[in-house]
Amino acid sequence: MTDRKLTFLRRFASTVVLWSIALWTILSGNEPGFMLLISGLGLVGLLEYYLMLDAKKLPNFKMFGLFCGALMLGGSFYMLGWRGLKPDAIYDFEIGALLLFLLVVFARQMFLTVQELVPLETMAFTLFGLFYVPWPFSFVAKIVYLTPRTAEGFVTGHWYVLFLVLVTKFSDMGAYLTGTLIGKHPLVPHISPKKTWEGFFGALAFSVGGGCGLVALMPQKLSFLNQTHAVILGLVLGFAAIVGDLAESLLKRSCGAKDSGKFLPGIGGALDLIDSILFTAPMIDRKSTRLNSSHTVISYAVFCLKK
């Protein structure tokens, strides 16, 4: 068996297993399982980020960063799911947590001698990891718990997480297929030589088409969205997914890494899997709750159009 076929089979097997677990967790409404899935992927992605820095010999407080990441992801689920805090309260919690992390990082230096002081880059690399992975990934929890529940108290936000993930992956699929078939004009060759403008527009077309298709197929499950929202969200999420993919490519190129890790055979690391979602999840923002409770999961772009 050739290396190319073996890579394809590994990628296919990893994709089937991963999507089976993810879809079952999302569609079943299993809240503890969903929390473990999101927190686990976020922490593994953060670990891969720090390991890439280690491979490049870039200093960082890896253990402190992982502890803060776990607190941020776990805290979001606890505050939203178990405490049932309102949007303003959870955002206050996150801001307070980030400020506390910053305070601890600087306070740590006060107990060291001049010879032991770590450079500013160490603190910057550590804190950047928190802003890059666990903080944006925690928006997935917000989508679940800030969406109105059913009269019986069951969450409905998992359907919008499914919408988010599928539209994001439609964007990735559109970029790959269009770029492979007709791609000729490089998008940003110094970052990712295989990315093309044709793939860029293909990604937007697929994400819009996928969003409209999902709203048409599941009108009752996605009752807070209509076709106009689907088009706008498709464009916003498609563009954000492209930027997220390029951002990770820039990070890997800076660290001299081909993949973020080997967590998923044939695919790469967890960070390779969630790179686009890190940028698309915050696009479905709670600011639209200022309209009324039935618009919780409509993106800020839709909110602005209604102003």
Language model regions located:
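Short helix-coil transition sites and intra-membrane helix breaks within transmembrane domains
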Residues: 167-170, 240-244
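Alpha-helical transmembrane segments that form the membrane-embedded catalytic/substrate-binding core
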Residues: 14, 175-176, 195-207, 241-244, ...
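Single conserved hydrophobic/aromatic residue that forms the stacking wall/gate
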Residues: 291-307
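Re-entrant/interfacial helical elements at transmembrane boundaries that shape
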Residues: 179-181, 252-255, 278, 282-283
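Hydrophobic alpha-helical transmembrane segments of integral membrane proteins
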Residues: 131-132, 261, 278-279
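Juxtamembrane boundary at the C-terminal end of a transmembrane helix
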Residues: 286-290
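Membrane-embedded alpha-helical bundles of polytopic integral membrane proteins
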Residues: 1-235
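Interfacial helix-loop-helix junctions of multi-pass membrane proteins
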Residues: 247-263
